[in-house]
Amino acid sequence: MDTRTPEVPCGDLLQNAAENLLLEVEEHFQALTTTLNLRMEEMGSRIEDLQRNVDDLMTQAGIENSIKEPAT
């Protein structure tokens, strides 16, 4: 008795197509992750700049900063 699984017509082609699709999705996901990380870093820098500008304006206006930032 033959215990091998029956050959599926075009099975190898389908498997290759699925593997290629998964690799392509993985590449796109990695590119998106990289882009999002860069944009988050840029946003963090902009927020820090904004906080410094607000602090400077408050100092110029003679207003004490009542909200203290945690030390980093």
From Swiss-Prot:
Pfam families: HSBP1
Keyword Coiled coil belongs to the record: yes
Keyword Coiled coil: yes
Keywords in alphabetical order: Coiled coil
An MF annotation (GO) of this entry: transcription corepressor activity
InterPro entries per the UniProt record, alphabetical: HS1-bd
Coiled coil ranges: 12-62
Family of the protein in this entry: Belongs to the HSBP1 family.
Protein name per the record: Heat shock factor-binding protein 1-like protein 1
Gene: Hsbp1l1
